């Protein structure tokens, strides 16, 4: 969503043809759809899926067990009205610039004040312009709280951005390896002989002209054994490759946070400058790396939720088993 939003915003700049804006995606509507789906998943589907999965076949469904999902679903709704009444308003202070005074009134006032005081330049500026500080109260809608509470997920992203690459690399390191004990060698020899006999039988049937459905089914079974082993090897090799790439992305993200986010003022734009230079060279050259970095950060947050688990009041979201 973020790369698509950035591309669509750039296509509506003033120096571009106005008709290009009509060809862009409706990003505002798409963002609302994503937020609504995320809200339904986080607050309804994920918390209460355990209540449905814990019900095993063969168990007696007593009244206490039936009331448990009702209580779990009714308690959050009973807490929402008082929380909404107490937390639905936000107080914030804004600065309202005053109007510039007319030269005639300003000169008349300055002549009268110079007779009594020796004015400095600061006092003159205070008299020229008067700034007002206003305290306003605004109504916070529900999406505001959803966006504000998303700051909690930074913990998962911070934990997993460091451990996700290492987990992938260690998964390759601790992959199943060849163990040539006597029992394993005997079992492997037996399965190899069986597979060899089946393969030779299929070859004889194919040479004899039999190409029915049964032959194709048996050939598919034999090929599936070889394919599954090849995919297993490629799966662990892919973990190693993505682990190394993820380690590089994590280091770059951490450096960007240190030099741009934690330092005030920022010491160096770093990733921002890189994306700007790539975007000036070509549209896809700037959008593709930006999408990769965003997607990696989102995957780190999701993986961190699965790795740590989180308790929201009495509801378990992504519990770690």
Swiss-Prot record:
Q: What is its main location?
A: membrane
Q: Where in the cell is it found?
A: Membrane
Q: Which UniProt keywords apply?
A: Membrane, Transmembrane, Transmembrane helix
Q: Does the keyword Transmembrane helix apply?
A: yes
Source superkingdom: Eukaryota
Instruction: Spell out where the chain crosses the membrane.
Output: 28-48, 116-133, 139-159, 240-260, 284-304
Q: Does the keyword Chloroplast apply?
A: no
Gene Ontology CC entries for this record: membrane
- Which membrane topology describes this protein? Multi-pass membrane protein
The record's PANTHER family line, in alphabetical order, gives: LIMR FAMILY PROTEIN DDB_G0283707-RELATED
Q: Which family does it belong to?
A: Belongs to the LIMR family.
Q: What is this protein called?
A: LIMR family protein SELMODRAFT_432210
């Amino acid at each position: 969503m973020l790369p698509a939003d950035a591309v669509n915003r750039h296509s509506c700049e003033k120096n571009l043809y106005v008709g290009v804006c009509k060809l862009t995606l409706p990003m505002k509507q798409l963002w609302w759809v994503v937020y609504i789906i995320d809200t339904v998943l986080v607050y309804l589907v994920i918390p209460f899926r355990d209540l449905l999965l814990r019900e095993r076949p063969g168990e007696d469904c007593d009244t206490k067990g039936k009331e448990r999902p009702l209580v779990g679903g009714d308690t959050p709704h009973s807490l929402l009205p008082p929380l909404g009444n107490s937390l639905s308003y936000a107080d914030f202070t804004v600065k309202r610039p005053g109007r510039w005074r007319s030269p005639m009134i300003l000169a008349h006032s300055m002549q009268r004040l110079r007779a009594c005081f020796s004015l400095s330049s600061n006092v003159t500026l205070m008299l020229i312009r008067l700034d007002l500080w206003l305290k306003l109260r605004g109504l916070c809608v529900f999406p505001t709280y959803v966006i504000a509470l998303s700051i909690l997920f930074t913990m998962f992203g911070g934990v997993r951005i460091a451990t996700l690459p290492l987990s992938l690399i260690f998964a390759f390191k601790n992959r199943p390896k060849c163990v040539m004990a006597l029992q394993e060698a005997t079992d492997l020899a037996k399965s190899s002989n069986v597979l060899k006999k089946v393969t030779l039988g299929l070859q004889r049937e194919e040479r004899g002209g039999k190409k029915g459905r049964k032959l194709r089914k048996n050939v598919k079974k034999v090929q599936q054994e070889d394919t599954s082993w090849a995919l297993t090897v490629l799966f662990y090799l892919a973990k190693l490759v993505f682990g190394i790439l993820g380690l590089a992305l994590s280091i770059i993200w951490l450096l960007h946070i240190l030099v741009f986010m934690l330092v005030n003022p920022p010491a160096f734009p770093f990733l921002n400058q890189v994306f700007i230079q790539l975007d000036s060279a070509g549209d896809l050259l700037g959008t593709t790396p930006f999408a990769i970095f965003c997607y990696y950060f989102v995957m780190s947050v999701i993986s961190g939720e699965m790795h740590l688990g989180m308790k929201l009041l009495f509801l378990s979201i992504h519990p770690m088993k």
